[in-house]
């Protein structure tokens, strides 16, 4: 038993993170070589460099401001050692991705779309920041009330969707593989609001292990960018470039966020990540690719919903109910089953990479 414990303690996320970063960089350079008009590597490399340096500079400042994460005591006991690790790291890197991504195009329509995506992403970053700050000042693992946070998220999403609707940026159909379309007409608007709320909270739930959300997010942004370039005239190089800038900012952050993490993104980063993914998917008619490629985010969210629903449905007079998972979200289920965090995270990255490849094979034409 002690040998297994010693072996686990020697594991860290250095090599898996290096492999992931190298794979994304390689994919960008290959795409630039093979796909006409592809310039994915430039925003990617710029964002990786800047976010790496800014996070390196910012972590000591977050620590000096006493922005240490409060760890919930009912979670995996191995996480208690992470208490005090600086959080709100999204504040350091989200603006990097947004600014570099916003410089990708100055053409009228594209520039306006990039501005709209940047604003809704930053709005969600601020909402997450308020939530994180509230948690830190109360010294608990909870910040804003769920209803209050959801209301703020919905307000920011509605403002974005109102702008997009006024400009005619969102079609009333969802493009599917094999030249199929799902006509939704006015139903696209409640679906779009649902996508914002569901995706941002799914990325938030995924941010529970060192490097998990940042690695998965970088892969999904890369996948969205690649499928946009593969769609030819139906794609959008400007939005693809924005995606690569966001992928780069999370890869730069991952260098400091991989196990053992020196900093956490907090709701500041995870909510912004989900908002950016949602906005890009809606403006580029990429809801289907996002659904496939973001399968890990979906699974994490569904695991929580199922856990809560089954527990409430089976709760007896003693207040106890059945649990489908050892603990939700899903990554904690594997942890409590004996799989170390240092193994769970690369496995979830690998699943996401597989889903990205599946999404590229089944992207809309």
From Swiss-Prot:
PROSITE patterns registered for this protein in UniProt: MRAY_1, MRAY_2
Biological processes per GO annotation: cell division; cell wall organization; peptidoglycan biosynthetic process; regulation of cell shape
Subcellular location: Cell inner membrane
Gene Ontology, cellular component aspect: plasma membrane
Pathway stated in the Swiss-Prot or TrEMBL entry: Cell wall biogenesis; peptidoglycan biosynthesis
Cofactor(s) listed: Mg(2+)
One annotated GO molecular function: metal ion binding
CDD domains xref list: GT_MraY (cd06852)
Segments crossing the lipid bilayer: 15-35, 39-59, 84-104, 114-134, 156-176, 178-198, 209-229, 235-255, 263-283, 291-311, 343-363
Keyword Cytoplasm: no
Cross-referenced InterPro entries: Glycosyl_transferase_4 (IPR000715), PNAcMuramoyl-5peptid_Trfase (IPR003524), PNAcMuramoyl-5peptid_Trfase_CS (IPR018480)
Main location: membrane
Keywords carried by this UniProt record: Cell cycle, Cell division, Cell inner membrane, Cell membrane, Cell shape, Cell wall biogenesis/degradation, Magnesium, Membrane, Metal-binding, Peptidoglycan synthesis, Transferase, Transmembrane, Transmembrane helix
EC number: 2.7.8.13
Entry superkingdom: Bacteria
Entry similarity comment: Belongs to the glycosyltransferase 4 family. MraY subfamily.
HAMAP family reported in the protein's UniProt record: MraY
Its job: Catalyzes the initial step of the lipid cycle reactions in the biosynthesis of the cell wall peptidoglycan: transfers peptidoglycan precursor phospho-MurNAc-pentapeptide from UDP-MurNAc-pentapeptide onto the lipid carrier undecaprenyl phosphate, yielding undecaprenyl-pyrophosphoryl-MurNAc-pentapeptide, known as lipid I.
Name of the protein in question: Phospho-N-acetylmuramoyl-pentapeptide-transferase
Organism: Synechococcus sp. (strain WH7803)
């Amino acid at each position: 038993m002690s040998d297994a414990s010693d072996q686990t303690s020697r594991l860290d996320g250095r090599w898996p993170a290096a492999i992931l970063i190298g794979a994304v960089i390689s994919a960008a350079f290959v795409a630039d070589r093979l796909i006409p008009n592809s310039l994915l590597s430039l925003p990617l490399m710029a964002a990786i460099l800047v976010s790496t340096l800014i996070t390196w500079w910012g972590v000591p400042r977050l620590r000096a401001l006493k922005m240490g994460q409060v760890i919930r005591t009912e979670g995996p006991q191995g996480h208690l050692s992470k208490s005090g690790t600086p959080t709100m790291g999204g504040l350091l890197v989200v603006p990097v991705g947004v600014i570099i991504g916003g410089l990708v195009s100055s053409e009228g329509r594209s520039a306006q779309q990039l501005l709209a995506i940047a604003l809704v992403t930053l709005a969600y970053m601020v909402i997450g920041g308020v939530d994180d700050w509230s948690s830190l000042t109360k010294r608990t693992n909870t910040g804003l009330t769920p209803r209050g946070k959801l209301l703020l998220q919905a307000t920011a999403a509605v403002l974005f969707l109102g702008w997009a609707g006024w400009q005619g940026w969102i079609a009333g159909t969802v493009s599917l593989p094999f030249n199929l379309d799902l006509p939704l007409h006015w139903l696209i608007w409640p679906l779009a609001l649902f996508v914002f709320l569901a995706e941002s909270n799914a990325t938030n739930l995924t941010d529970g292990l060192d490097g998990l959300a940042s690695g998965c997010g970088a892969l999904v942004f890369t996948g969205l960018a690649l499928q946009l370039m593969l769609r030819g005239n139906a794609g959008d190089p400007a939005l693809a470039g924005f995606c690569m800038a966001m992928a780069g900012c999370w890869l730069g952050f991952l260098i400091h966020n991989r196990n053992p993490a020196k900093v956490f993104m907090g709701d500041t980063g995870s909510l912004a990540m989900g908002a950016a993914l949602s906005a890009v998917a809606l403006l580029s008619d990429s809801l289907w690719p996002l659904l496939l490629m973001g399968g890990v985010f979906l699974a994490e969210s569904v695991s929580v919903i199922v856990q809560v629903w089954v527990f409430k449905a089976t709760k007896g007079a003693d207040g106890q109910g059945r649990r489908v998972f050892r603990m939700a979200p899903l990554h904690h289920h594997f942890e409590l089953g004996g799989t170390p965090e240092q193994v769970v995270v690369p496995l979830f990255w690998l699943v996401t990479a597989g889903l990205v490849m599946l999404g590229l094979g089944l992207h809309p034409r």
